[in-house]
Amino acid sequence: MLLENLFSNVLDMSITASYVAIAVIVIRFIIKKAPKSFSFAIWIPVLFRLVCPISFISNLSVFNFINRDSFRKIEGASQSITVNNTISNIRSGQVSDNIAGNAVTNIANNTTISQGIGNNFMYLVSILWMIGIQILIVYFIVSYIKTYSRIKTATLYNENVYESDQIDTAFVFGLIKPKIYIPVNLTESEKIYIIEHEKVHIKRKDYVTKIIAFLILIIHWFNPIMWISFILMTRDMEMSCDERVMKNLGEDIKTNYSYSLLNLAVNKGNTFNIPLSFSENNIKSRIENVLNYKKPKKWFILIIALAIVA
């Protein structure tokens, strides 16, 4: 019973978060020309709704039009109609006492059977949910071990940056003491751009954000909208990081930086990408965003920020 109640609560939060995620996806499309840091930030309410069972709904919220109690009423509508019809027939004398007694007994039996089927179904679904969580946890552990086995022979390049001939893309690995790992075939200019990109991840604590998001995703693995949201969130994370690199190093690096991303994509093989690391992904969209990047005006940022808050 405890497992079913737990899954029921998770399901409720997942459904509510789905509405928020759809709204975020729409807003994300509307502000697609805005800095990606805004697109990245608006995923916070989705993460919040996935873990918080308490609703904070304004009078203008669309959720006010969705009365969850009405769904519970609908569930018993058919049964209520049957009971009312039977009682009406008894009162009008259309059925004998024996038939009336049998009818009431049948209704009680049907109600018990329906409840039993519902409880069994919820129990089975809860078991499947828990199995899915365990599978994803095992996948995470195996991925972590496999990645660690590849980088344990890496050599120090400088500070917390390591080079390895066992990887073909750059990424941050580790949670408590994150380190930057880069492939050995990068040029010196590529190293500057790629290392700066990974340093931004570390400075913003993106490695913490991503692992929290993935752990939440494991709990809500049954919801396809959450998988889509996770992919889009990590995409916004990467592109906002690219924009920060250009802000730090100057917009004149657009072309060379794009070539660096493209080079990593061409050489990328089967390196495991796990939540504790950041490997290069969705290169096409990232390159397009880099080449089209323009430092936004302050008034534009203010308008977008006010629109998101509203």
Predicted region positions:
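Low-complexity, acidic polar-rich segments
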Residues: 82-116
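Membrane-embedded and juxtamembrane structural elements of multi-pass membrane proteins
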Residues: 2-78, 111-310
